[in-house]
Amino acid sequence: MERGTSKFSWIGLVARIYNYIPHPSIFSNAILGIAWLFLIFLCCSCLTKSSIFARLLRVKNETTTVDVGFFGVCDQAINSTSRVCHELRNWDQTTGGLAYETSRFAWLQVHPVLLAIVVVFSTLSIVLTILKYLAPAYIRQWSISCLTTSTAACLLLALQMALAHISANSYAVGMNLTGKATAKFGVAAAVFGWISSGFFLLFSLIHLGLWTIERNKQKLFEETSLSFSFITTKLRLIETQYFICKDY
Amino acid sequence: STTSKFQLFSLATNVAQINVGYFNMCVLSANATLICKPQFTGCPGLTSISLTDVRSKFLINEVHPWMIVFSFCVCGVSFLMGVVSSLPLIGRLEFLRNIRISLSFFSFFSILVTALFAHVAVSSFVMAVGNGTQNRVTASLGKKAMIFLWCSMGLVTLTGITDSIILLVTSRTKKIRKTILEKSKVLTPSSSFSSKSSTTKY
């Protein structure tokens, strides 16, 4: 009866799910790699001509079409087929009013510096994953650090995607209402961002399961040590009594 | 006339200024006439932006005014739970305190989301409308409303932190009392053992 009344805990559930994953180390490393790749592709949006698919916002005027990403902006005149791409901060004010305006919006409202911080955390997580194989003596410390950095990357990326979603949608509505231009929110950027954030969360959960199993092993070791120390104390007690009898 | 001072944003033309709040719009004309309505169909000085579209496409879809009503309800329930917990006999119940702390965290989160939505959406909209170079409409952010939103979030955060600290201190005190009781129980076999040994010696 005592076995059936064991308490339910979320960490126990995570550990049980972790036991069902085949090859959890390879699986978690693949998840981290996919999340990092999606993140890098999101950062490179609108920096080159071929990467405007993952744009954040597309603004059309009578004369130009501007695609804005997190760090880049692309400008294309209506009557020409060529497209000019630049970083956000390198865009000159004199070349085009709409491109400069949208670049200023992306830098001031979307806060892509937050995405740069996410890239730092995710790269640190990958470095820690590599260190698990280079220095396996400290695998517990590397795993805990991986859990921390990937959780931070997940939360910061979710915050960044929320900010980008709200601000880009509001900017698009403002552009449409004033009649300056026709603006449309880029769905692919949102999809890439949320997939990346979800995969960082999966990686964190898998490492939480690993950490739980390690803690369970440590608890078992401590209980065994306590049992042996109890036997040792008992032996000392018997020895003391024998000593007292002998003296008398 | 006080409701026109705490607007989310304002649109200014040469003829009039429109203050847009969560549920109300106020038009201040050039001859100092102030008219406040939930919704305006047209404004004499404003021709390029439709106020109906401002309300239906921006306020309802982006700012989400239902969220501030929701936050108000959550904070109201949390405040009522605090009032109920301060009554002499009911305050000792354990689950009321847990409910109050959960509600406090929930109200913090809802006000945070409300303030983020309002600030980010209105800032982006104001930047999109611009400073009147092209269509002679100047948009500006309502700073008083934003300051009020963030101050209320700060106060709710302070309340939540205080409640958490009080709960931690109370539970720690209970643990210390339990430890003292256990120690006083453990001391009894030691005394009996010493009495037994003295009996054996005699």
Curated annotation (Swiss-Prot), chain A:
Describe the family membership recorded for this protein in Swiss-Prot or TrEMBL: Belongs to the SUR7 family.
Q: Which UniProt keywords apply?
A: Membrane, Transmembrane, Transmembrane helix
> Taxonomically, what lineage is the organism?
Eukaryota, Fungi, Dikarya, Ascomycota, Taphrinomycotina
Major location category of this protein: membrane
**Induction of synthesis:** Expressed during meiosis and in response to nitrogen deprivation.
Q: How does it sit in the membrane?
A: Multi-pass membrane protein
Protein's name according to its UniProt entry: Delayed minus-nitrogen induction protein 2
Q: Name one GO cellular component term.
A: endoplasmic reticulum
* Record organism: Schizosaccharomyces pombe (strain 972 / ATCC 24843) (Fission yeast)
- Residue ranges of the TM segments: 26-46, 110-130, 144-164, 186-206
Gene that encodes the chain? dni2
Please cite one Gene Ontology biological process associated with this protein.
Answer: plasma membrane fusion involved in cytogamy
The entry's localization annotation reads:
Membrane
